[in-house]
Amino acid sequence: MNKIIHFSIDDCIEIFRDITINNYNSLFESDYFSFFKELHDKYDAKISLYSFVEYKGFNIKNTTDKFKKEFINNSDWLKIGFHGFNESSRYNGKENIKKDYKLFIKYVKRFAGNLNIIDNFVRLHYFSGNLENILKIKKFGIKGLLTADDDRDNYYLKKNENIFLNKHNIYKDIKNEIFFIKTNLRIEKIENINETLKTIDINNNIIMFTHEQYLNDKNIRDKIIDIYEYSKETHKPDFINFVEDEFKDIKLDKIKKFIDCYIPITTCNFRCPYCYITQNNRWNDALPEFKYSAQYVRKALSKERLGGTCLLNMCGGGETLLPPYIIELLKELLEEGHYIWVITNGSLNKRFEEISKFPKNLLYRLAFKFSFHYLELKRLNKLEDYVKNIKLMQDSGASFSIEITPYDELIEYIDEIKEFSLKNFGALPHITVAREDNTDNKKILTKLSKQEYNKVWSQFNSKMFSFKLSTFLVKRKEYCYAGKWSYILDIGKGVLRQCYSNNQQQNIFENMKPIKIKSVGRKCLEPHCYNSHAFLTWGDIPRLKAPYYYEMRNRIQSDEKEWLNPYMKEFCSHKLKENNNKFNF
């Protein structure tokens, strides 16, 4: 697929003064516009002129209207966009952007004939604009904003959003339907064009710009031509079509169902003493055969059947990513539109390399819970691979979380783990609460008292640990919507259950009949909700005040990146009750 090339000029005003004070018979007798037409005729260039209303003693309201017809006839490739009222304009405060923008379109319409020439993507002066002001101009048809060519803050974006944008070159504010495209080439800063051309990644878009004051410089023009010449076979100027296509699957979704999916594998390349498979001696060295194809599972778990976008949590008894089938399954379910978390030990390099090649719009809805088996990783000399795979997933656009299963033998290594984590992950891991799975009450896996256990592991300041420990061993007697809002699913057999211990189940793979399982209600068969960090934070018990799921998974790194990308963080900031019906009692 071709990438796009977009060229724009900031601080425009002299362009319009020039055609006003000179006695040109055609717009393209102007040295400025003749250059633009040369680019268009040779490279099909589409060019945006980001203009002030007034600047350097000239106001665009005085622009001649004698070239109105030529502006109209060329408005498919020549656009005029708002840059600000003047060089002092900043829209981060109470400045009246609405008034300025209305004047701008009024004046441009007068001399350019109609509003088809107005660019609905703009680059505001100094990349300034708070949300209130951007929403004001959005009402006039503005779809998005071009952002800085460096790492500075852009408009109203939060730090995590800005970092994500600078890494992936595009970002969509899904709450407000506003697009952001990163500028990556400032022509006047290019010292050696040949060296710059070597650094251009043909797999990425070229969003280049210069300022009007440099346009008369032949060296600047030559660099622009060189870039167009270099990219003419790989990049097209279809800017708007690209944006709409790139963002079509990225939208504001609220969770419909939470489904904890069991992958029937009891094979693993690790042997951790605290693992429940180890506790119950259920290891099997053979990889499972899956009865149902990934395409069939997608159909069974379609958004239409389930009622909307779901969060699927994929967890194997052994290492989840060992079966090659899982890669195909992930891709199918992501293409269906669901969000997915995968539980993994993070050691299978090949699997992560395969996943990193997924389309970006799929990776944005994918997350990994990297189980941090520190001593096992160290024993197998896999720590370096573990870190590399985490960084690969983050760089690819996926989200992640790092989680330690605490056990008594690990306590003496806590300082070592913390030092390693801060150095390599930029933050401390989250801490879960391990259970003795072969006991009736599934008590905490420790010889310490609950108070001692809390004192030892709370030093990681994990919200996951504090919430999970607060609910551990607490029998739930409230009304629970598990069975209606959340499920347990065996991916191998297709058996869907209310919860881990349940009164009802249905095989949803054998037939595609509607799902008819009732809520657990007040008849929970478990001694306590030992996975409260998921089921209770998503809100299976609406009456219970619980944090959001993103708080169980996210961390802010020392470099201000976050473990959850903005899309996953937004999705995990909602509750099941927002998109499901509650019963009246």
Describe the role of every protein-language-model region.
Residues 1-73, 118, 208:
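Active-site beta->alpha N-cap acidic-glycine motif
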Residues 46-133, 153, 208:
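Metal-dependent polysaccharide deacetylase catalytic core of the NodB/CE4 family, i.e.
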Residues 279-292, 308-322, 333-351, 361-385, ...:
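Core AdoMet radical
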Residues 60, 114-208, 217-222, 247-250:
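Active-site-adjacent pocket scaffolds in enzyme catalytic domains
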Residues 373-492:
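Radical SAM enzyme [4Fe-4S]-AdoMet core and its adjacent flexible, acidic
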Residues 440-585:
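Accessory C-terminal segments flanking Radical SAM cores
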Residues 34-45, 59-83, 196-202, 303-305, ...:
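Acidic (Asp/Glu)-rich catalytic clusters
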Residues 252-295:
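Canonical Radical SAM [4Fe-4S] cluster-binding loop centered on the CxxxCxxC motif
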